[in-house]
Amino acid sequence: MSDIDVLLQETRTFPPSEEFRAGAWVRDNALREAAAADPVGFWAKESEALDWMTPWSTALEWEPPRAKWFQGGTLNASVNCIDRHVHGPRRNKAALIWEGEPGDRRTFTYWDLYREVNLAANMLKKLGVGRGDRVAIYLPMIPEAVIAMLACARIGAIHTVVFGGFAPESLRDRINDCGCKLLITADGGSRRGQMVPLKRNADVALKECPSIENVLVVMRRRSGVGDETFAEMQEGRDHWWHRLKRQVPRYCEPEAMDAEDVLFVLYTSGTTGKPKGIVHTTGGFLTGVATTTKYTFDLKEEDVYWCTADIGWITGHSYLVYGPLANGATCVMYEGAPDWPDKDRFWQICERYGVTILYTAPTAIRAFMKWGTEYVKKHDLSQLRVLGSVGEPINPEAWMWYHEHIGDFQCPIVDTWWQTETGAIMITPLPGVTTTKPGSATVPFPGIRTALLDANANELTVGGGLLAITHPWPSMLRTIWGDDQRYVDTYFSKWPGRPDLYFPGDGAKLDEDGYLWILGRVDDVLNVSGHRIGTMEVESALVDHPSVAEAAVVGKHHDLKGQAIAAFVTLRAGFTASGSLRDELRDHVAQKIGALARPDDILFSADLPKTRSGKIMRRLLRDIAEGRALGDTTTLADPSVVASLKDQYEAQES
């Protein structure tokens, strides 16, 4: 692969304020420099912040592409997230502040969480679940989802969380691939005022899941206290959570788990092919997420921290559950949609609980931009002090909007790059020391080594190329469940003869200051007249125009240029699609990054096809632009969007 052309230049910079720097955990480059000199030593030292039942003897064994961290050590994830806080001054500190979509609220102190997790762990044991057994968790965003994860960890069972929005087929495939013994689900969940029939979906899936012996059902929807009429229960197999809880002891002894014992398996959403069961281990994963939570968000004892991600994604695992709770944080958890019952729901929650750290996705930020600032201005967001972005690269203009309208120019923005496979944040600013640039994830986290390479593994010092991680890290995936060869082929075979190089599948560019800019999946790179252009740059140029809320670009076949650029655009409130605006946007891109990147086609749309985790599905947009039959749409949040786009595009072409 040739290098990726770098077209978009960003010169705006934002250093941390002296006031923020003075109070930050990391306020100079000493930590980063020490970690760069000795990454293993850095992670070894950070692992000491955890409570170990048996101290580890060897920090790292590395036989590429296989890493083992903290060999000889034993620990328990639930002890690190709960017990150690209960036995200290955080006993009565709020651990979890939960708000349901209908407006119901529950708060759990660390002591409350401790009691609930012990009871849940004993429920699992009563149903025959033990160390090494797999438990599927198919729940809405309710506290029992967190409790179930920690209960599994307490007894050494391996949890695999399945996003509550997935259809029965997706649930079935994940249960069967992992060989789950127990399913934990709910009678339903709330989404935009409608009840999602989780138990009914689960029953459909379980018709083809021979490994499931028992089902534990949480009562979420009810017309009155104790109303069990919403779910059909199968005698002998299905058990109500609230009933079983009354039948078990209050204390459950935590299992001593080896550092390399599996903590959980999480399936990537699998937009193509069979979903991959990413395997994460106890000691390394906990070390990675606890350390990155503390330093990336500058997490302090008094913070109220809200990661808006669903529990079904890695961000929910790492930065709603394990990372913050290992640090003894107060976490906000919300069940519903950001625009229900109105478009200010997020800001209402931020104001109500005095949220100080907000971690959300670019797709949400672009939606807020599209809706306008009137919803933000209704609320006092002055408690916010750190803003985070996760899930995909953030366009510079969305970054600036976030900085101005949510952060009031006062809050550092940590634009984080990482993956399900990496387990924890890999590239990010540190808010007390890093000068940020809109759209750049900046530099690797301390203890992480990255490089920009060409197709022959030659290192590039500036410009565009392939992102590689060149050194093992504690929270890295260990394998793909049941398919170790796929692990090697997918992540460690990009550069033949170099099994030490992890390839995440992303292109990136390095600027003159050594900052990294993620250009998107290498599969999405455009090839226009021999020039390789990252989709991110063209999309950012479009979003830079005041009329555009969100944009996605793909390549389509062109007889002369190889590929032409097709853009799909949603407009901000107050703007109307027209031929003149289409021409204006094409000229704007040409002016911003060059005539080479001028889109050939622009289609205005009310929405873009996205996965349930909010990522734009460019594969389907390519199908539309090329006039092909649509590929697999099962992971779409709203399949009607892509059908409507296809009709629109075909009408415009004709």
Curated annotation (Swiss-Prot):
Keywords: Acetylation, ATP-binding, Ligase, Magnesium, Metal-binding, Nucleotide-binding. Its EC number is 6.2.1.1. GO terms for cellular component: cytosol. Pfam families: ACAS_N, AMP-binding, AMP-binding_C. PROSITE patterns: AMP_BINDING. GO terms for molecular function: acetate-CoA ligase activity; AMP binding; ATP binding; metal ion binding. It is an enzyme of class 6 (ligase). The modification N6-acetyllysine is found at residue 615. Its cofactor is Mg(2+). One of its GO terms (biological process) is acetyl-CoA biosynthetic process from acetate. Acetylated. Deacetylation by the SIR2-homolog deacetylase activates the enzyme. ATP binds at residues 391-393, 415-420, 506, 521, 532. It catalyses: acetate + ATP + CoA = acetyl-CoA + AMP + diphosphate. CoA binds at residues 191-194, 315, 529. The keyword Cell inner membrane does not apply. Mg(2+) binds at residues 543, 545, 548. It comes from the Bacteria. Catalyzes the conversion of acetate into acetyl-CoA (AcCoA), an essential intermediate at the junction of anabolic and catabolic pathways. AcsA undergoes a two-step reaction. In the first half reaction, AcsA combines acetate with ATP to form acetyl-adenylate (AcAMP) intermediate. In the second half reaction, it can then transfer the acetyl group from AcAMP to the sulfhydryl group of CoA, forming the product AcCoA. Belongs to the ATP-dependent AMP-binding enzyme family. HAMAP family: Ac_CoA_synth. NCBIfam families: Ac_CoA_lig_AcsA (TIGR02188), PRK00174.1 (NF001208). This is Acetyl-coenzyme A synthetase.
